């Protein structure tokens, strides 16, 4: 989504504004299976940094604004952080789902919450994965291990895309 360099200081005469909203839970059904890692507090939870309980629901919340000339999407994800490549994944999914919706921009933000599932791959068995990846680099054999959980990240991408589709 390229956005626009045009600055508009007045609404057009026939402008009709619309707003859409949607939200979804980012807590998977199997969250307590010992497979998900808590972001932000590795030293406090060492050596086990797995999610042990859920106090509050993690959510993605989306607002879509339309001024009659195009839609602008704002999605906020309750997570420690979200990488540029992850945002591109979400944008690609939205582009496929909503190709006829005249979306001008898709903006995705993280709340930087320190008590949620790790979306950056830093609060898991990091050194084990680092050692494995160094071995793969030097040997040229095997596959690299991602710090993030690909299954969870796809879940997050799907839920975020779903809220955008619903809000549009």
Show which residues each predicted segment covers:
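Conserved beta-alpha junction segments in alpha/beta enzyme cores
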Residues: 1-168
């Amino acid at each position: 989504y390229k956005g626009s360099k045009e600055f508009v200081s007045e609404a057009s005469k026939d402008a009709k504004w619309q707003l859409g909203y949607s939200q979804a839970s980012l807590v998977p059904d199997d969250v307590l299976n010992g497979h998900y890692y808590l972001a932000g507090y590795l030293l406090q939870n060492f050596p086990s940094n797995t999610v042990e309980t859920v106090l509050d629901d993690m959510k993605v919340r989306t607002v879509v604004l339309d001024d009659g000339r195009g839609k602008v999407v704002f999605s906020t994800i309750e997570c420690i952080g979200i990488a540029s490549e992850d945002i591109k994944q979400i944008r690609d999914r939205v582009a496929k789902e909503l190709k006829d919706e005249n979306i001008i921009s898709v903006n995705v933000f993280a709340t930087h919450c320190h008590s949620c599932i790790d979306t950056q791959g830093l609060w898991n068995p990091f050194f084990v994965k680092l050692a494995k990846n160094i071995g793969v680099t030097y040997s040229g054999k095997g596959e690299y291990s991602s710090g993030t959980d690909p299954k969870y990240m796809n879940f997050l991408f799907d839920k975020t895309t779903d809220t955008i589709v619903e809000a549009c």
